[in-house]
Amino acid sequence: MAPWTRLLPLLALLSLWIPAPTRAFVNQHLCGSHLVEALYLVCGERGFFYTPKARREAEDLQGKDAELGEAPGAGGLQPSALEAPLQKRGIVEQCCASVCSLYQLEHYCN
């Protein structure tokens, strides 16, 4: 009997023993420290974009002042311009309130 025919049953058993590849990261909710850890994992040495909440609020207030016409050359928009609901599209809304993928997380890398 040829030597390769003896190896055939062994190869068949080995192929059954090797686990099928699974997705290491499925789309999931990531909040708080889990979100930060996932960003470190995805971005590595590049780091990721982060704006502290206090800084964002200050920038939002400056933007609202400009919309109301308090900034020079703003054109004097009426307060009704602020009545439309603001749409949040940050990483927390994308990955904590909803699910996100590694590909979506990668958009926040530097």
Curated annotation (Swiss-Prot):
Disulfide bonding pattern of the chain: 31-96, 43-109, 95-100
The UniProt record lists the keyword Electron transport: no
Signal peptide, first to last residue: 1-24
GO molecular function: hormone activity
Family annotation (CDD domains): IlGF_insulin_like
SUPFAM superfamilies in alphabetical order: Insulin-like
Pfam families according to UniProt: Insulin
Propeptide: 57-87
Gene3D superfamilies, sorted: Insulin-like
Location of this chain's protein in the cell: Secreted
Keywords: Carbohydrate metabolism, Cleavage on pair of basic residues, Disulfide bond, Glucose metabolism, Hormone, Secreted, Signal
GO biological process, one term: cellular response to oxygen-containing compound
Region annotated Disordered, chain positions: 60-80
GO CC list: extracellular space
Family stated for the protein in its record: Belongs to the insulin family.
Function as written in the Swiss-Prot or TrEMBL entry: Insulin decreases blood glucose concentration. It increases cell permeability to monosaccharides, amino acids and fatty acids. It accelerates glycolysis, the pentose phosphate cycle, and glycogen synthesis in liver.
Self-association and partners: Heterodimer of a B chain and an A chain linked by two disulfide bonds.
Protein name, per record: Insulin
